[in-house]
């Protein structure tokens, strides 16, 4: 019996058994609540998507954990742009009205993010960087005017799995909520697929979300006393200011 551990996740500890089964264990109560949300969403969502997503074979409430078959694949680089767009279209067209999901007041939630960043991240920047950081924080006021849709909220390379050159699976749905679909384009438009033809306003908001990504990493590093997260987060933050 082989056992591999992935301890990198913010919310979950992951164990892989015999290269076949994934055991996902929340680190705290908020993560356990996210896991319960996933358990309610994924069975309804799976038939609507052109890719694999986790299908929980076992879900325990106490202690909280889930088990599902490993979805095989390598992290997305520049593969299968048409397949990725087909996945996004299906995801954002999904009617989640009957599913218990977070439905935050989007602007207010981002105002709260900005307030935290202003308190704990902005002071870590050099004086010459702070004005640009403050200008970015003020741009959260422009995150309006979109039709809220189901969003994954954490689409990056390690959550988009490719087999034989095609997008085959999407994992880690803990952040799924009703929100701005531009958030799901943030990394995609600013790394693997910058030439995609998309609406200018969607691209603008996606760029904002991408620029804010490292602020969350710095905050996480400070909160969990992990200096490496702070260091790498600040490096990425500066590159996106």
Predicted regions located by residue number:
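FAD-dependent flavoprotein oxygenase/oxidase catalytic domain
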Residues: 10, 48-53, 72, 95, ...
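A cross-family signal for key residues in well-ordered alpha-helices
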Residues: 43, 189, 219
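Hydrophobic packing residues in well-ordered alpha-helices of helical domains and bundles
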Residues: 35, 81-84, 133, 211, ...
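Active-site Asp-x-Gly
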Residues: 30-32, 146-151, 156-208, 212
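ATP-binding pocket architecture of kinase catalytic cores
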Residues: 2-106, 122, 145
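ATP/Mg2+ or Mg2+-diphosphate-binding catalytic cores
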Residues: 32, 119-124, 128, 200, ...
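An alpha-helical support segment within catalytic cores of ATP-dependent transferases
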Residues: 1, 72, 80, 93-153, ...
């Amino acid at each position: 019996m082989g056992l591999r551990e992935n301890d990198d996740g913010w919310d979950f500890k992951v164990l892989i058994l015999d290269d076949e089964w994934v055991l996902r264990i929340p680190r705290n109560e908020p993560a356990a609540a996210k896991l319960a949300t996933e358990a309610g969403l994924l069975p309804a969502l799976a038939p609507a998507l052109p890719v694999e997503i986790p299908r929980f074979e076992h879900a325990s409430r106490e202690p909280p954990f889930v088990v599902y078959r490993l979805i095989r694949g390598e992290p997305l680089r520049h593969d299968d742009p048409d397949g990725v767009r087909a996945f996004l279209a299906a995801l954002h067209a999904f009617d989640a009205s009957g599913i218990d999901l977070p439905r935050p007041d989007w602007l207010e939630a981002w105002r709260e993010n900005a307030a935290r960043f202003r308190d704990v991240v902005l002071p870590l920047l050099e004086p010459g960087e702070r004005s640009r950081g403050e200008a970015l924080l003020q741009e959260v006021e422009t995150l309006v005017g979109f039709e809220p849709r189901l969003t994954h909220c954490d689409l990056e390379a390690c959550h988009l799995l490719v087999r034989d050159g095609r997008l085959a699976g999407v994992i880690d749905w803990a952040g799924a909520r009703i929100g701005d679909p531009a958030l799901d384009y943030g990394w995609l438009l600013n790394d693997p697929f910058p030439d995609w033809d998309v609406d200018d306003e969607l691209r603008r908001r996606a760029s904002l979300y991408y620029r804010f990504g490292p602020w969350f990493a710095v905050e996480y590093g400070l909160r969990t006393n992990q200096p490496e997260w702070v260091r790498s987060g600040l490096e990425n933050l500066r590159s996106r200011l």
